[in-house]
Each structure stands twice: as structure tokens, then as C-alpha cells.
Amino acid sequence: MDMHIECINGTPIVNTLDHLPPLPLVVKYIFPITEQDELGIYHALRLHGRIRHINLHLPPSMMQQCLVLMDTHFPMLEYLSLSFEGDKFTTLTLPKAFLAPNLRHLDLPAVSPPKRLRLLTSSLPLVTLVLKNIKASSYFRPRVLVARLRSLPQLEELSIQFSIPIPRPSAEWELSGEQVFPVPLLNLKKLCFVGVSSYLESLVAQIWAPRLTQLDITLFNQIIFALPRLSHLINIMQSIGPKFSAAEVFFRRDEVSVTMPRHASALYFSLRVRCVQLDWQIDCAAQICGALSHELSGVKEFRLNIYDQNMPTEWQNGEIDPTTWYELLRPFIGAKELQIHDGLLEELSRALRVEGRDPGFLPNLQYIIAGTNLFTWFLDTRVLVGRPVRFSLPPGSPLVPDMTIHRHSSAPERVRRRMLSRSWSLRA
């Protein structure tokens, strides 16, 4: 039986805890905090030898006092999550003397780990390691992280998220000499990263994760993206099961994402780049897809999506070079279906008009799926070059008589039924 005592909001810990059996403690307090709760937190933390679980979300000043009380040994602690309310510029650090040899779950969304990640040397059973909002003052190089990961054989989930783009481009040369024999992380299944591509490349070059199935990456914007090590990692992911068969590029207000979602297997890949202007987003997506062209070559269903029903007003004035769209679409040589959101129809119709005569462009494409057929010229051209493409309405659209659709023949009903049951459509 898992018998323990819960120290939570609203419980009179100070007056009752000393009169209860010495069972393990679960300490869980979430803002807002009363004066009684605050005293209860401090009282419980002083009993560090009995604490099994700590989950605190507090104001910065109160969290600072808790960290002072945590500057010691927690022999029973298995779960630790520390975050604070409000001020994102406050820097709080886990004390150097804090040790938790039985820790299995470490989640620090706001509190920084000790310098050089010394905490990890004493937490061998760790299964989940989440370090978020890492500031410049808490920066650690990939080789330091990997050296600590070497001693975590049970690790299944790793999340490293920087709050700013570090290192700066002028200092990225420091990462180029960090290529070493990869450290095996035999149980790692999920990797999340937020930062710059040079750090990501250095990190994935130093690990070997044969069981990785989920990869979630967010990169800060930069001029050039080179991702050979990431490409290799995705190849390893696909070697353990079916390859990715569907992909989506999603243009949002402040980021663009390239996603290959779960389909018949547990594999999941998502890469986002933080940028605002549409031309930047298209260029970033084109570079990402180009860098991962080998991994995208097996995709059969490709979708272009945008966060608004129509092209946002602030994006309508800029002229997008059609060749940029061409570079984005070019890696999808195996795609049979191209689904286009209504907000992107005019942009894509212009781009396909330019590139329609290239027989090497989307050579296996069979269907364009969209709410309106603006692709007559492209469809006619593909017939002339011997690579016919059909137009089809998306699932759920009313079947309105349309001469263009009849002329080029819509997708068979069996394809429409399959599209209606498709599970790969992504979240907005």
C-alpha cells in the first residue's frame, strides 16, 4: 500500500503533522498561497528525510525561501517540480548541497539547476529530466550535459529549453570541437529542445538513442539552417518502425512548424521556427524541408496550413517569390496528395503556375485537395507533360457542381472516404 501524508493548500500542517505517524510526505502547493499554507510549506520542507514528492508553484520570494530550506539531502525524494508565479526575469537556482539519490522525475520550468548540472551526478534513477527557461547565467555546453546524461541509464524523457538564443553566433565555434563518441541513451523515448540549431546539432551528435520515438524541437530564427545530425537522428527513429507517411507545414502568427505526426506508429516529429513575417516563415520551412529531404521523401500525404481562414491582412501586401514555395515543396518527391488551406490558395496557385512544367517537381502527385480550384493551368500542364493530377474538395465540403472539377475528375469516392477517416490532421 502506498501510504503517505499530503501537505497541500488548505491543510493545517503545522498543527497536525507532528501528531501523525511518520509516513512519507507529498508536498504540493500552488499559488495563491495563504499565510497558513506558507507556514505549512516551510514546516514540511524541514522534514526533508520524509519527503517523497515536491510540487511547488509559488511567488518568487516564497520560492527563494523554500530553496534555502532545500540546501540539504532528500534521501526519499522521487519527484521534484519547482516553478514560480509572475516575474520571468527573476533568476532562482537550486542550492549546491541539494541531493536526491532516488529522484526519478525532475521538472524545473523556472528554477535553474546548479552550475555544471552537479545535481545529476547523484540522481541515477532519473527517468524524466525537464529543464526549461534556461537563461544565459545558467548556460551549460552540450558536452557538460552529455557527460551528466552518461550516468542516467533509465532516462526516458529529456527536455532542454533555453529562454534566449545562446550561444550567440559569434561563439558557436566553441561547439564545433565537441564531437565525441556518442553516449548511449538506451531508454530515451522523447526529446524536446528549444534553442539554436548549432546547440541542437552538437547535442544530437553526442548521443545515441535507438528507442527514440518523439522529437519536439523549437528553434530561434536564423539566416541559415544546417541540420545533418538531426537528419541522422530521424533516420534512426524511422529504422525501428514504419517511416513517416504524412507531413504538415503550418504557418502561425509568430512561428512556422514542420510536423510529421503519428499515423500507424508511435513516431512523432515536430520542428518549429520562431519568426513573424510570412516570407521568412516560408524560407525557414523551405530550408528545414530541404535539410530533411531524405526523411521527407517517403511522405505520401502533405498539407499546407495557416492559422487564419484567409491570408492575414498584414501578410497580403508583401510579394512572395514563387520559387520560395517551389523550394518548400520540392523535397516531397513521394507525395501523392497535396492539401492546401484556403488562406494559401492564391499564393500556391501562382507558385504552381510557374513550376508546373518541371517534370521533376512533385513527380508522384496525384491529387490537389482544396476548397476552391485555382489550379486549372497547373492541372492542364501536368496532363501535357504526362503526369496528370486531379483536383478534389476537402473532406466535409459540399459537392457543388463545378465544370473544372468535372473536367479533371475529382478523387474517387474511396479516396474521399479514406480522407474523412484520416487521423493525421493536426491541431490548429
Language model segments and positions:
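Leucine-rich repeat
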Residues: 1-428
